[in-house]
C-alpha cells in the first residue's frame, strides 16, 4: 500500500493548520504551494539531499527532517541545509544535474522507482523549495498517519 504524503510551503501556524486538515481527511485549501506524492517519506527526502549535495559538491549539513510538534506527529520540517541544496540544484550550471540526481535517487536502496518517475518529482520539488526560499516560507512534509 502506498504511503501518501504532501510537501508544502507556508509559515509555521499555517503548517499546523494544514496538517490538522490533512490528518482529518477534510478539505484542504489549494492556496498553499504543495506537491502531493506517494511513497516519499522523511528517509527518502534525506537520501535525495545526500545525492544532490554529493552531485553538486555542496558539502555536508543536516538533512534529517524533524517533527514540528509533539501534537503533530505526521508533520516534519525540511532543514535549511536540505532546502539550500535543492535551491542550488535548480541553479546548477550543469543542465544534466537535475536528471542525474533524479536517476541516482531512483536507484537508491530506499526508493522503489524509476528516473522517469523521480525526475518530475525532483523538478517540482526544486521549484517549490526555490519559491518558498524566495518568499520567506518554510517547507514541510506531511506523511499520512499509519
Ranges and model annotations:
Residues 1-127, 131-135, 145-146:
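Acidic (Asp/Glu-rich) sequence patches and key acidic residues
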